């Protein structure tokens, strides 16, 4: 008996067992079975190089193992990879104990907010505690069981620490239920004490069997369908909001059929954008604070809002003024029950694609009363054309962001940066020049607002926006994740100078592994979007421009930085040089960077429904701030309260 039992086990270290288990995880989406864990990003230190590092070096299986260059950066690459593939595949990431693993926290927050599966494998202190305190250990007075990795608990959907080799089994089974469940997907942390990583155990062979995690499309109940049909049939001007959940559901075709059949306009959240083509006639574009005039116009007319996989963030709802249950009824389709309950909506806890398809079958001959959708969209396209040709050299030029910088300040920026290029002109020039199958990513600063309004993604799933956590520094590592996910398509990071400075280390990873990415740095020498907010709320410009202690505008040569890494770099300060740089970059096989100097205050501004509740000071000596505070109070009075 004992001998037979022995044959049914295999003696492995904890790290070896982990690697073997990862190799056996598969996912079934609509009958298509693929491996779930593509690989692992690693920055090795003393806490993981001898345990997990040795296991990967000895036998990684099919896992692709990449060396990262910043923990937050490589985790962002993993997040973008999974997001681009609708969460059907993941990367794991590992770092050493202490500061290396602490660098995961921001990325974990990003994954949590956006419901993106990623497996964090931070090294930890010794489970035995014999050598305590070890290098990079935090000694906590109230608990010897607390380490740096505990900081990952609030930003993990599941968190565990493996203090004995056999604990790995139950921990991983729970972890992969979370990682493969569309309703609960998000970051998982499995902390690995460095002594336990190398400890051996007789693991049951059954633990390493091929495991296929079936992604079930949750169907709406008959009561949910009947209730939604009744609400839609009673409405005259319904609007469909397409959120990130609709994209993850691969609901594009169902959305178009539903919209076309019933003449229902579509508006998009930042995450939902490109679920369908921008050319689709009823697609009015981005909605909310960063929305188009077309999208916000139809939202204003809506008597029913159908939310398809949206979380209703403040940027979508204009801090609950554009969407108000006291004025508009709502239907929420979401796999997450809590999300479906928002705004006192009629909840449908189900898959977006299948719910819309079944509603299409049930609504029969219904048609909305919208008669002017084409006119509304055409008017917005005319405005987009104007923004494509804004000209600083025109007589009496007025920037899009008005009444903040005077003509003298604008001239100083033009002289220092040696540019007359406006940001809207540059963004649309890029949109019109890159191949339509190319994928762009943006995340922070003023660029998310510009691309939400004026970027037209003709090809679905070519627009990758991280505006849930709006993590500065996401863009460059995300471009690499996108390239790994879609190697046959060009990947472009649209990034401001402030965000690029915060994090761009995975450009080195892209160069190291010959994965071409393209970085477009829009440099206006400052944290310009926050400067806009600061001045719009009455404050003076303060620590949001990049100026020396002598108050001189700073100019950074980002092209030279990229060249130092080994990338092909370009400089652009007008439309002609920008287009020429893009065209030449297309021909390159190495990663590229275009240093685009743009003028501040030349990004897009609000179009209707753009009130945003921010924390203006109640007491200030500045009369402009006093007025801004009163304006905020007026907005609060109009907003929905919960």
UniProtKB/Swiss-Prot annotation:
Binds 1 Mg(2+) ion per subunit. Binds 1 thiamine pyrophosphate per subunit. The keyword Hydrolase applies. GO terms for molecular function: 3D-(3,5/4)-trihydroxycyclohexane-1,2-dione hydrolase activity; acetolactate synthase activity; flavin adenine dinucleotide binding; magnesium ion binding; thiamine pyrophosphate binding. Its cofactor is Mg(2+); thiamine diphosphate. It catalyses: 3D-3,5/4-trihydroxycyclohexane-1,2-dione + H2O = 5-deoxy-D-glucuronate + H(+). Pathway: Polyol metabolism; myo-inositol degradation into acetyl-CoA; acetyl-CoA from myo-inositol: step 3/7. Gene3D superfamilies: 3.40.50.970, TPP-binding domain. Mg(2+) binds at residues 497, 524. GO terms for cellular component: acetolactate synthase complex. Thiamine diphosphate binds at residue 71. It is an enzyme of class 3 (hydrolase). Residues 446-526 are annotated as: Thiamine pyrophosphate binding. SUPFAM superfamilies: DHS-like NAD/FAD-binding domain, Thiamin diphosphate-binding fold (THDP-binding). The keyword S-adenosyl-L-methionine does not apply. It comes from the Bacteria. One of its GO terms (biological process) is L-valine biosynthetic process. It holds the Pfam family TPP_enzyme_N. Its EC number is 3.7.1.22. Keywords: Hydrolase, Magnesium, Metal-binding, NAD, Thiamine pyrophosphate. PANTHER family: 3D-(3,5_4)-TRIHYDROXYCYCLOHEXANE-1,2-DIONE HYDROLASE, THIAMINE PYROPHOSPHATE ENZYMES. Belongs to the TPP enzyme family. Involved in the cleavage of the C1-C2 bond of 3D-(3,5/4)-trihydroxycyclohexane-1,2-dione (THcHDO) to yield 5-deoxy-glucuronate (5DG). NCBIfam families: myo_inos_iolD. This is 3D-(3,5/4)-trihydroxycyclohexane-1,2-dione hydrolase. The gene is iolD.
């Amino acid at each position: 008996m004992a001998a037979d039992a022995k044959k049914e086990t295999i003696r492995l270290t904890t790290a070896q067992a982990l690697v073997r288990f990862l190799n056996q995880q598969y996912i079934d989406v609509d009958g298509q079975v693929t491996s779930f864990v593509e690989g692992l990003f690693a920055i090795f230190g003393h806490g993981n190089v001898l345990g997990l590092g040795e296991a990967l070096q000895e036998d990684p299986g099919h896992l692709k193992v990449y060396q990262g260059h910043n923990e937050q950066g490589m985790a962002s690459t993993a997040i973008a990879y999974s997001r681009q593939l609708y969460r059907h595949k993941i990367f794991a990431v590992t770092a050493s104990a202490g500061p290396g693993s602490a660098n995961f926290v921001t990325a974990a927050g990003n994954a949590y907010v956006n419901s993106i599966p990623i497996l964090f494998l931070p090294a930890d202190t010794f489970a035995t505690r014999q050598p305590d305190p070890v290098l990079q250990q935090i000694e906590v007075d109230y608990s010897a069981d607390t380490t740096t990795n505990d900081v990952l608990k609030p930003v993990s959907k599941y968190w565990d620490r493996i203090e004995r080799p056999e604990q790995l089994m139950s921990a991983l089974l729970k972890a992969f239920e979370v990682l493969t469940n569309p309703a609960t997907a998000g970051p998982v942390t499995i902390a690995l004490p460095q002594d336990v990583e190398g400890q051996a155990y007789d693991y049951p062979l059954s633990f390493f069997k091929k495991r296929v995690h079936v992604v079930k499309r949750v169907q709406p109940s008959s009561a949910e369908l009947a209730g939604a049909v009744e609400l839609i049939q009673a409405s005259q001007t319904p609007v469909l909001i397409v959120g990130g959940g609709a994209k993850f559901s691969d609901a594009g075709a169902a959305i178009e059929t539903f919209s076309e059949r019933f003449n229902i306009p579509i508006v998009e959240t930042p995450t939902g954008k490109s679920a369908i083509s921008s050319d689709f006639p009823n697609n009015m574009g981005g909605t909310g604070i960063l929305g188009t005039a077309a999208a916000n116009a139809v939202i204003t007319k809506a008597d029913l809002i159908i939310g398809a996989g949206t979380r209703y963030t403040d940027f979508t709802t204009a801090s609950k003024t554009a969407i108000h249950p006291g004025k508009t009824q709502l239907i929420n389709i979401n796999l997450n029950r809590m999300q479906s309950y928002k705004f006192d909506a009629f909840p449908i806890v189900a898959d977006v694609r299948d719910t819309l398809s079944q509603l299409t079958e049930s609504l029969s001959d219904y048609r909305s009363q919208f008669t002017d959708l084409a006119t509304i969209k055409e008017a917005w396209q005319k405005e987009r054309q104007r923004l494509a040709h804004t000209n600083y050299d025109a007589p009496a030029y007025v920037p899009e962001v008005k009444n903040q910088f005077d003509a003298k300040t604008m001239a100083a920026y033009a002289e220092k940066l040696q540019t007359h290029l406006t940001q809207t002109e540059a963004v649309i020039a890029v949109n019109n020049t890159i191949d339509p199958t190319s994928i762009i990513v943006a995340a922070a600063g003023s660029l998310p607002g510009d691309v939400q309004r004026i970027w037209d993604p003709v090809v679905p799933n070519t627009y990758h926006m991280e505006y849930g956590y709006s993590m500065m520094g996401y863009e460059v590592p995300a471009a690499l994740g996108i390239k790994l996910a879609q190697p046959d398509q060009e990947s472009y990071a649209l990034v401001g100078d402030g965000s690029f400075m915060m994090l761009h280390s995975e450009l080195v990873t892209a160069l190291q592994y010959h994965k071409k990415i393209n970085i477009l740095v829009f440099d206006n020498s400052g944290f310009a979007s926050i400067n806009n907010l600061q001045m719009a709320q009455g404050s003076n410009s303060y620590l949001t421009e990049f100026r020396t202690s002598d108050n001189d505008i700073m100019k950074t040569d980002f092209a030279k930085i990229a060249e130092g890494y080994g990338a092909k770099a370009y400089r652009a300060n007008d439309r002609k040089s920008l287009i020429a740089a893009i065209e030449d970059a297309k021909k390159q096989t190495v990663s590229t960077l275009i240093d685009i100097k743009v003028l501040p205050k030349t990004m897009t501004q609000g179009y209707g429904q753009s009130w945003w509740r921010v924390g203006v000071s109640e007491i200030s000596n500045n009369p402009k701030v006093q007025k801004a505070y009163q304006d905020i109070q007026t907005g609060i009075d109009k907003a929905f309260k919960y």
